[in-house]
Amino acid sequence: MTIRIGTGVDVHPLEVNVPMHLGCIAWPNEPAGCSGHSDGDVLAHATCDALLAAAGLGDLGEVFGTADPQWANASGSALLTHVLQLLSANGWKIINVSAQVIANSPKIGTRRAEIQQAMSSALGGAPVS
């Protein structure tokens, strides 16, 4: 069995009155969210980027380019599920995902398990920490 590890990073500008999505869940009490072509879920996007890199299948921009209207306003979970399908079609299996969020807000501690469950569900049950 071949095991590969990928690293992904994603950055979006914060904008007031834009809904915050992080880790495939909504954060309705946040005053600002990440703007972008899709839902701006930087955690889901960085995870997609890492998985694509590990499998040698390109990067987030190649697979979900902003010129493709199919991905306009797409959720982080939709992107993760599509990446899972791409990986599976190319003979790859996700063993686990480990991700870090570097931000002052939102405070994810109380919703960590919810994020892990939502992302794991989008990735076909692969463990997420």
What would you call each of these model-derived segments?
Residues 126-129:
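Short, intrinsically disordered, charge-balanced linker/junction segments flanking boundaries
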Residues 2-123:
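RNase III-family endoribonuclease catalytic core
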